[in-house]
Swiss-Prot record:
This is Large ribosomal subunit protein bL21. The keyword Acetylation does not apply. InterPro entries: bL21-like, bL21-like_sf, Ribosomal_bL21. It comes from Leptospira biflexa serovar Patoc (strain Patoc 1 / ATCC 23582 / Paris). GO terms for cellular component: cytoplasm; ribonucleoprotein complex; ribosome. The keyword rRNA-binding applies. Part of the 50S ribosomal subunit. Contacts protein L20. GO terms for molecular function: rRNA binding; structural constituent of ribosome. This protein binds to 23S rRNA in the presence of protein L20. One of its GO terms (biological process) is translation.
Amino acid sequence: MFAIIELGAKQFKVSPDQVFVAEKTGNTVGSTVETKVLLLSDNNKVNIGSPALSGAKVTLKVLEDCKGEKIHGFKYKKRKNYKKSWGHRQQLQKLQVVSISG
């Protein structure tokens, strides 16, 4: 059994008890999240929503907050003595699929 869910602006293929990393949802550690289900597959039966399935739901549990790799940016203008650098680390959350129903 697996489902395609939409979390934020991204889609993920998930199955029961799977742990995955996604962008931060704004929920606290230990809380549960219910997501929009786009596709639900159970052995040979496949249900496709347009755009989402109304009766299906996937429950996720927030395990921990973490950060992605650091990305470095650099801007430079020749002969003007102008240099600017910056860095960014994306806020992420580790999520576990608790249940898939529908």
